[in-house]
Structures are given as structure tokens and as C-alpha cells.
């Protein structure tokens, strides 16, 4: 059926964002040196060399210009995966997502069917005191469980303190290796992660080493942080075929006054704003206010959907990973350079054995490749 409709209509069909990936190209480990991961550089499609595949992320030093604003997401992945014990000593896994009410937190559970309402759980650790929990309800939207924690676990800080003692880093299920937990505690965090609250890493930032960041600053590149706590919705599969009225998850975003003022200055010049990761794109684009037609600081949950047809107001370029088929992240990148071109680039990446997903290689969408029709004229 999809083959019988035009390309613009196909942009709004989930099936049009599917592709085949050999499982051997799914990265289970990161590059040994962050800035040595491979980099595909995407340029304007009219250029003879519209795609470079022989680069590494350290070559971003040649791509970014003096005066460019590079925006990073400084969220930190919490040890949000907990193993709890039922009365019969059966183990169940929880993934803590967000606070629901007072000391009640929404968690995904595996296997969820064992967690009936009012069932008691015990959180155990070899070096810590046992903690009693209870199932308080069922969330119809996610299929998760509302779990009642001790009365003092009422905010993100107190929960993060508990998770630091009892939890583990929640790696995506496709990362299968025998590395120690301590390995992922470092490798699955960006070098600038300081604000705990995410349940998944903003993975494009994993490519930026301390030395690369230092060299970019020496060149005159401005690097500023935003915070977007990556939530469950980032990796939740899209469950509707028609994307016309797509609604996505909410995520907590903070963009401060310093970043907003820099955006306003840059938009009056020929300087550029480059986002490190799709989460930074979502945060930056969310700070535009339609009511006053201007950029404003924000600290709130946002549910912005970026898909083909979206007009970018803030972002000019993007460093990103290679994303899962049929994902909201694939829609976002397609909004920048077009779905067909993006899928052609993915075919090229697969042919040249680039590594995919969270620990994989990177793609840099240079500002000259962003389609003019997708830029909002301020």
C-alpha cells in the first residue's frame, strides 16, 4: 500500500522508516577512545562530496568554526535499574522512570504480571539495609507499576541517592557484553554529565572526549549546556502507523538564560548553532515561544514532536548516532535532511560497516545540509 502513495505522504507512515540492519553492526562496546569513533559527515546534497565516511569524531575540530555555539546535554544517567525480591524470593526487575505522587514512583517491571496491587517487595543489597516497597497501582499507558518507596524518597535527589546504593546503570537490551558494571558507569555517561535524572544516555555526547572539548574551546567554539532528562519514551517503540497526529513522551527540560541570550545574539549574525544529540535539539527548539515569537528560558516538561514538515527555529547542525528503525529519533533527523536522503545515508553506513545505536559511530549533519524548506524564517 505504501508504494502507491507519494513521497510526502510516505513521510507520515511509520513503515517508511524501517530498514534492515545486520545484528553484527550493533555496537556492544564504545570506541576505546571517545573521539576515535567513526564519523560520517553529511554535506549539502548538491556538492560532489556530499558525504564523507573516512573521518573520526576528532575531525569535528575541523568542522566547527570560531564563534559557533555547540550545545550539549548535561543530564546524567541514574542507576535506575533495581532488582527486588518478592515474598517467595522470586526476583523482579524495576526500571525507575519518574515520580508520580509523594513517595510513589512509576516503574517498568519485568515480569510485570507478578506485581499485583498491594504486593510487597524487598529491595536488597549486600552492603545496605533491606528496604520495603509496595505495588501501589498500574499505569495503563506504559503497563508499568506505581511503586511506593519509603516516605523520605520524595524527589529526584533522594531517589538518586537510593539508586546510587542499590541500583545499576540501565543499559539498552541490545548491549550484551560481559563488562563489569563499573565500566558502563563511566562509558555510558558523557564527560560533562552532572545532573542526575536520565534513564538513558544522550548518546551523541559519548563521542566528545575531554581533549576534544578543550581543543574546541581553544578554537573559539562556545560550548554551553542544557538539561534534558532522557526518559522511557525515547526508546519506547512508536505504536501507530499514521504519524500525522503523532504524540510523544514528555521529558524534563531546562534551558537557562545564558543559553537563550546566546541564541538571540547568534540569530542576528551568520554564526551557527550545533546540537550534540537529538535531545539537545528537542530542548533548544522547545525554548521558542509562539505566544511572544521569541526565545525564552524554560524549566518544564516538554512534549515537542519533530518530524518531517517541522520548521527549525534554533538548530543549524547536529551530531547524532545511527538510530533504531521506526524510532522517533529517526523522524527528527529526517526532518532536517529528508527521509529518503537519510535512509540512503544509512544504506551507505551499513555498506561501510559503521557501528549502530548507543555505543556506535556518529553522523554529523552540517548546517549546509539542512534543507532550506525546513528552516523557519524569523
Curated annotation (Swiss-Prot):
Superkingdom, taxonomy of origin: Bacteria
Major localization listed first in the record, in broad terms: cytoplasm
Signal peptide: none
Cytoplasm in keyword set: yes
Alphabetical keyword list: Cytoplasm, Queuosine biosynthesis, S-adenosyl-L-methionine, Transferase
Catalytic activity entry: 7-aminomethyl-7-carbaguanosine(34) in tRNA + S-adenosyl-L-methionine = epoxyqueuosine(34) in tRNA + adenine + L-methionine + 2 H(+)
BP-aspect Gene Ontology terms: queuosine biosynthetic process; tRNA wobble guanine modification
InterPro entries: QueA, QueA_dom1, QueA_dom2, QueA_sf
GO molecular function: S-adenosylmethionine:tRNA ribosyltransferase-isomerase activity
Record's subcellular location: Cytoplasm
A Pfam entry, by short name: Queuosine_synth
Pathway field: tRNA modification; tRNA-queuosine biosynthesis
EC number of this enzyme: 2.4.99.17
A single GO cellular-component term on record: cytoplasm
Function: Transfers and isomerizes the ribose moiety from AdoMet to the 7-aminomethyl group of 7-deazaguanine (preQ1-tRNA) to give epoxyqueuosine (oQ-tRNA).
Family: Belongs to the QueA family.
Subunit details: Monomer.
Full protein name: S-adenosylmethionine:tRNA ribosyltransferase-isomerase
